[in-house]
Amino acid sequence: MMSQTKLEISMKANSKSKISRRSLLKSGVAATTAAAAGTLGAPMIWAQSNIVLRQSGTGVSAFNEIAAKAKEDLGITMEMTALDSDSVAQKVATQPKSFDIADIEYWMCKKVWPIGNMQAMDTSKIKNYDKIVGIFKDGKLTPTSTIAQGTAPHTVSFVDGANGKNFSSEETGWMTMIPTIYNADTLGIRPDLINRPINTWAELLNPEFKGKASILDISSIGIMDMAMVCEAMGEIQYGDKGNMTREEIDKTIGIFTEAKKAGQFRAFWKTFDESVNLMASGEVVIQSMWSPAITAVKAQGKPCIYQPLKEGYRAWAAGFALPKTTKGKQADVVYEFINWYLSGWVGAYLN
């Protein structure tokens, strides 16, 4: 589980590929069953109001099927824009009028919240709030769980009031974002081309794979993969991978810079499709990877494994956030959409 392993909360960007990103996704609500939906009462229907919700996010959950179901159940027309992680953060920070709801990643909160374009979300309006798992409230999945390193979601989940600017360490009734999905990532491998067991992050820099390794080129995520590798190699013991010292940063970057100079990496990838193409072609046999990309490689008839590693996983989480420009009836529609999103159908679909 997320909070019981050595994890860094990060996130990923996906392209507009039609390949399903559902594999291994988990809903941010502990119980999102069809039965739960029945206890919420019928959702409001907005069809006669010609309501359009502009959703901007990374594409992890930007499915046409979800938009169609929202139209069927709520009468809302969803316009979904999928971007890479850095572009999403930039858009949220600089173009709040260009969207009504943001599907963003928890690591982004420290970047975008201080700018002041987002509004806190009232948890009393979230019908399934009591079912949101503890990872997003106090950092623990169970009472005995160990809180993860990195930007653990609960550290940026709450602010100190409706107009709060500071993150709160405890529940306040006002969330920066309402959690929707989370997962944990590891290395992807081509077992047919490696022909031996892989059980540690350290293998990414094994000279055996010189010219056939890859790592993702998204700085906020890539640095975490790099840290997992360096610690697995015994080169660095981090105090907190999500809050590295300058010395830790320099040493981490130094190790990977030397590996790059030595020709360890075939390429660096930034998008979902790039990672799929590198692995499916056989140009790369071991790399940072996302579970849906594994599925995409397999769909091309190539063996590909999402390899469990003894050091644990790098986790990520996402949710819906509200810009200050979304007000009145439009804000009411956003809350209605989120309640519908957490009521069962979407959770079942994404799983």
Segments predicted by a language model, with ranges:
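N-terminal secretory signal peptides
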Residues: M1-S23, A30-G38
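A bilobed periplasmic-binding-protein/Venus flytrap-type ligand-binding module shared by bacterial periplasmic
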Residues: T186-L193, V229, A317-Q330, Y349-N351
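Extracytoplasmic ligand-binding site segments that recognize negatively charged/polar headgroups
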Residues: S61-N64, W113-E274
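Early extracytoplasmic/lumenal segment of secretory-pathway proteins
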Residues: Q48-I115, V276
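Alpha-to-beta junction loops
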Residues: Q95-D103, N117-Q119, F209-G211, S281-I286
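Extracytoplasmic/periplasmic substrate-binding proteins
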Residues: G263-K327
